[in-house]
């Protein structure tokens, strides 16, 4: 089970976008040799805007770029950043906030 999944509300903790809050839209996994990397695409964070030329004129477009999962942290229900742990509940593994000990 993964610590951050799509649909989670996260806060960017480092980089140019530090302090911004958004919802994870997609989790991307890539491997280069033996190194495995995990990236997330967060809505309204790390967005680049550009102009496309069309026959009708100019069209403004925006694209979200991935952020390394180590640069984001999960937001707990009280609005503060929390680490994620795991507990067994009814025989299944569930994620919990370590800060509040509540289930995600």
Swiss-Prot record:
Function: One of two assembly initiator proteins, it binds directly to the 5'-end of the 23S rRNA, where it nucleates assembly of the 50S subunit. One of the proteins that surrounds the polypeptide exit tunnel on the outside of the subunit.
This protein's UniProt keywords: Ribonucleoprotein, Ribosomal protein, RNA-binding, rRNA-binding
GO terms for cellular component: ribonucleoprotein complex; ribosome
One Pfam family per UniProt: ribosomal_L24
Family designation: Belongs to the universal ribosomal protein uL24 family.
Domain of life assignment: Bacteria
Entry protein name: Large ribosomal subunit protein uL24
NCBIfam families: rplX_bact
One Gene Ontology molecular-function label: rRNA binding
Subunit structure: Part of the 50S ribosomal subunit.
CDD domains registered for this protein in UniProt: KOW_RPL26
GO biological process, one term: translation
Organismal lineage: Bacteria, Pseudomonadati, Pseudomonadota, Alphaproteobacteria, Rickettsiales
